[in-house]
Structure formats: C-alpha cells, structure tokens
Amino acid sequence: MLIGLTGTPGTGKTSVSKLLEKRRGWKVVYLNDLIKEEHLYSEVDEERDSVIADMELIRERLSGILEEEKGQHAEKAKVNGEEKENITIIESHLAHYITDIVIVLRAYPPELKKRLEKRGYSEEKINENAEAESIDLILAEAFEWCKKVFEVNTTGRTAEETLGDVEKIIDYILAGKENELQEYIPGSLDWIDSVP
C-alpha cells in the first residue's frame, strides 16, 4: 500500500517519517532527496532556491522503486511466514501528486514561520510557505488529486505525538475502519486570517 505524507515545509513530514521507518519498519521514500540525487527535475529555480520537479520522471523512478520493494517484501514474507501488508510512505510536499491515500500534516502559520526561521529559510520563502499554509494550498491540491485525504494538526505537538495520529490513521485504513477516523477529516482548520 502506498501512502503519502504531505504538507507545507516545516509541518513535520520528515521527522514523523523517520520515526515511522524506525518504529514500524516501513519503507519511506524521501521524494525531495530522490529528486535532487537522481536529477528528476526539469529546471533549477535559482531565485527561489529550488528545483522544478519532473513528475513524469518521478513516477517512472518510483514505479521501479516500488516494484523492487514489492519483491523484497514478498521474499521477506516467504522467509518469515508473514502476511503483513507492504506499506510504503512517500514523504514530500509533492506526495499528493503521486498517491491515492494521503495524510496532510498542518501547522498554524505563525508557528510554521518560527519552525522555518530555525531552519534558516529566507524571509521570502518563510512568507511564501506560511501563506500557502494559511490558504490550505496543499490540502486543496490533495483533494484534487487523491481519493482519500486525512488531516493532522501538528501545532504545538512533538513528532512523537504526531506519529501517534499518523499510525492510527494507517492502522485504521489497514483494518478497514476508516469511518472511525472522523477527527482527521479535513476542513476543521481555518487559518486564512493568520497571515497578513
């Protein structure tokens, strides 16, 4: 099963993904790293200090990675006699363009700004990301691209606390109990007035 963990930069995707990888042993594809390492982009945006991802190249490369992972999982299951679901997490602010199931991590824009300042982001990039968060940009895109969308508020919470919510969502999906995830249905967070 392929699950996206997405959100504006600074919402906790990487921290939670590392914990998922360690605690659950699930495969995590850190998509932004893969894009840079394997040059899966069409151009470099010097002004914004970023690259323009080539989604076609990314999908092709991910297909290969997922086939490889599927084979490794099947081999491991054969040896260990396991019948566990093969879970792969795609971690990126672009994950919702790849997966049908996505968990969108959110953070109150003023807190998001503080997190990005600690990372040394430029003021322009901080404001751009805080504004994107305040208008629900990634959440809106997730609705457009994905079949199942869940939302987790990371404001004032540690990565471990957020991990508990993400694990619960995935475990309930695996158990067929999605209807019991009402607290993660998107739309309860409204931060439109939080950024001038």
From Swiss-Prot:
Gene3D superfamilies in the cross-refs: P-loop containing nucleotide triphosphate hydrolases
Q: Which residues cross the membrane?
A: none
Q: What is its EC number?
A: 2.7.4.3
Keyword rRNA processing in annotation? yes
Q: Where is this region: LID?
A: 118-128
Q: Which domain of life is it from?
A: Archaea
Keywords, comma-separated and alphabetical: ATP-binding, Kinase, Nucleotide-binding, Ribosome biogenesis, rRNA processing, Transferase
Identify one Pfam family in the record. Answer: AAA_18
Extract the ranges annotated as region (NMP).
Answer: 30-53
Q: Which InterPro entries does the UniProt entry name for this protein? A: Adenyl_kinase_AK6, P-loop_NTPase
Is Nucleus there in the keyword field?
no
One annotated GO biological process: ribosomal small subunit biogenesis
Q: Which reaction does it catalyse?
A: AMP + ATP = 2 ADP; ATP + H2O = ADP + phosphate + H(+)
Single GO term (MF) = ATP binding
Q: How does it assemble?
A: Interacts with uS11. Not a structural component of 40S pre-ribosomes, but transiently interacts with them by binding to uS11.
The role this protein plays is: Broad-specificity nucleoside monophosphate (NMP) kinase that catalyzes the reversible transfer of the terminal phosphate group between nucleoside triphosphates and monophosphates. Also has ATPase activity. Involved in the late maturation steps of the 30S ribosomal particles, specifically 16S rRNA maturation. While NMP activity is not required for ribosome maturation, ATPase activity is. Associates transiently with small ribosomal subunit protein uS11. ATP hydrolysis breaks the interaction with uS11.
| Family under the similarity heading | Belongs to the adenylate kinase family. AK6 subfamily.
Protein name (record): Putative adenylate kinase
